[in-house]
């Protein structure tokens, strides 16, 4: 019976527009992800990116932000910090912070790309078989993808409008969608986190400065995807 429901769900997803189907798949995957699997994926990204960028000047480091995974609702508040480091100098050149949804998107992008790169390098005639020769600065390209994911925040409901409202759980919505939802509900449409008062229910993102954003992130009330300052 369970398998039948799962098959029917997948059939419905397959009929959705590609962008919406991708969003639904990512939400389902994040919902079933265990904490151990999550940590495994963080470690896997570190291994994969290190292998692909071997011999290059820069590399990426993925870390769970300390304290962000200690809650029973870790999927809502956990943050993954992605840092680009110059190997020779040890200088941190860029750092971004992602929520779980953004991290899963990046994980899929990088592992999919890495599989192709490693397959290509295995058939290469180069004697060292160094996959880093495929792309001269892979870390910078990946960091660009992280920036894209964290800058282009969309409404979690319609996946079309620009998110201009953020809840304390860090899920973002456009004004039109959240107005319809909040008429009858006092919780987040995505994670169902209850809002205890009107003053915390719907927080308007009002083009804050970088300093405002940094402080907002540290207070765990900001949306993911803003520049992270270690």
Swiss-Prot record:
It is a lipid-anchor. May be involved in spermatogenesis. One of its GO terms (biological process) is protein autoubiquitination. It comes from the Eukaryota. A zinc finger (RING-type) spans 155-192. It is found in: Membrane. GO terms for cellular component: membrane. It comes from Rattus norvegicus. Keywords: Lipoprotein, Membrane, Metal-binding, Myristate, Zinc, Zinc-finger. This is RING finger protein 141. The keyword Cytoplasm does not apply. One of its GO terms (molecular function) is ubiquitin-protein transferase activity. A lipid is attached at residue 2 (N-myristoyl glycine).
């Amino acid at each position: 019976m369970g398998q039948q429901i799962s098959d029917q769900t997948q059939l419905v997803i397959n009929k959705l527009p590609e962008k919406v189907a991708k969003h639904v798949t990512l939400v389902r995957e994040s919902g079933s992800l265990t904490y151990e699997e999550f940590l495994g994926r963080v470690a896997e990204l570190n291994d994969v990116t290190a292998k692909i960028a071997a011999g290059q000047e820069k590399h990426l480091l993925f870390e769970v932000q300390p304290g962000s995974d200690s809650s029973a609702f870790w999927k809502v508040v956990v943050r993954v910090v992605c840092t680009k480091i110059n190997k020779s100098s040890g200088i941190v050149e860029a750092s971004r912070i992602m929520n779980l949804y953004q991290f899963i998107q990046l994980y899929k992008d990088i592992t999919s790309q890495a599989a192709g790169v490693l397959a290509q390098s295995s058939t290469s005639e180069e004697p060292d078989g160094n996959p880093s020769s495929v792309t001269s600065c892979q870390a910078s390209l990946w960091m660009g993808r992280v920036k894209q994911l964290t800058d282009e925040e969309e409404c979690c409901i319609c996946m079309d409008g620009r998110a201009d409202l953020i809840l304390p759980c860090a899920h973002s919505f456009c004004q039109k969608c959240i107005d319809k939802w909040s008429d009858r509900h006092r919780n987040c449409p995505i994670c169902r986190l209850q809002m205890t008062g009107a003053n915390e229910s719907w927080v308007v993102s009002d083009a804050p400065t970088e300093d405002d954003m940094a402080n907002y992130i540290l207070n765990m009330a900001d949306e993911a995807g803003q520049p992270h300052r270690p």
